[in-house]
């Protein structure tokens, strides 16, 4: 019984230790925020830009009386409520009155005029660790503009929710696009901070040597752990990634976007469903289940 209790205690302790991480935004708030007090600040953020207590970075900046002059927002928008691929117009944050510049509309990179009144650009967005998830493309284009305009670029790092595990082939650079910009694996195993360092070190942007890049690192991140091991609330990074399981499935099932098969977007179970009116579901299920994928069973569903 003592041994059994020891195992249970050890397991609980492991869970607690895995959950006891400090996000980049937590470290920034406690240790670095005074360094930008006299700067003109722009934020590249969305609804996931929360500290460990659930407070949004805009509230943190406002409470510390920092000079916030502009907000940039990626695909899915500032509030994360726009569907994939939908172009988004510039608008205004109703709380601060600050301009919100869309980087998924007419332009995918900040314009020269939008960078003119900025001293420092802070990136704080939860990525999901997949090459074709566009937040890292937005990160790259913003880094390039920061280098061009001599603007400090700070990344508040966050865990890769899919851990540091790597899966999939490297991108053929001849097919580089906004949904696959760099020669990295599909499931790349990196944080956004590590991606930013890789981009700068490999000179994947123009004027990379001029970029003044600062990464505010996560503290006590165990890169072997999936997101559910941490004592953090899952905030859906986009409308069709409602939970961690969907993020894991997205790694492979998002490839169906390049075909005439639906991946279930807009349903209650995106990427857990796929299909088409012309598919013979019985034959397909029989064929897929013969692979005996660990933890996966295919069954017939109907959806619109």
Which residues make up each language-model segment?
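N-terminal phosphate-binding or glycine-rich loops at protein starts, especially the Walker A/P-loop
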Residues: 21-66
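Glycine-rich, charge-decorated loop segments at or immediately adjacent to ligand/cofactor-binding or catalytic sites
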Residues: 80-85, 154-176
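Glycine/threonine-rich flexible loop motifs
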Residues: 127-139
């Amino acid at each position: 019984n003592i041994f059994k209790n020891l195992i249970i205690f050890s397991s609980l302790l492991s869970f607690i230790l895995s959950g006891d991480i400090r996000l980049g935004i937590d470290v920034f708030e406690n240790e670095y925020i005074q360094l930008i007090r006299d700067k003109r600040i722009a934020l590249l953020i969305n609804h996931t830009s929360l500290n460990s207590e659930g407070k949004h970075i805009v509230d943190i900046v406002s409470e510390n009386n920092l000079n916030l002059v502009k907000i940039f927002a990626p695909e899915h928008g500032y509030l994360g409520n726009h569907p994939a691929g939908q172009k988004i117009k510039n608008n205004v944050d109703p709380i601060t009155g600050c301009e919100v510049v869309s980087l998924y509309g007419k332009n995918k990179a900040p314009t020269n005029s939008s960078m003119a009144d900025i001293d420092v650009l802070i990136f704080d967005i939860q990525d999901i660790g997949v090459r074709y998830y566009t937040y890292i493309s937005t990160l790259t284009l913003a880094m390039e503009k920061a280098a061009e305009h001599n603007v400090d670029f700070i990344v508040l790092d966050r865990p890769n929710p899919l851990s540091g595990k790597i899966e999939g082939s490297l991108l053929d650079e001849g097919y580089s696009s906004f949904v696959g910009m760099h020669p990295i694996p599909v499931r790349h195993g990196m944080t956004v901070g590590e991606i930013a360092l890789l981009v700068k070190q490999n000179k994947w942007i123009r004027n990379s040597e001029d970029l003044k890049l600062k990464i505010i690192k996560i503290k006590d991140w165990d890169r072997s752990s999936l997101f559910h091991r941490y004592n953090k609330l899952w905030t859906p990074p986009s409308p069709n990634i409602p939970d961690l399981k969907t993020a894991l499935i997205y790694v492979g099932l998002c490839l169906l976007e390049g075909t005439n098969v639906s991946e279930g977007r807009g349903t209650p179970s995106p990427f857990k469903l796929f299909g088409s009116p012309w598919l013979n579901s019985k034959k397909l299920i029989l064929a897929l289940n013969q692979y005996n994928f660990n933890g996966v069973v295919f069954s017939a569903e109907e959806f619109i």
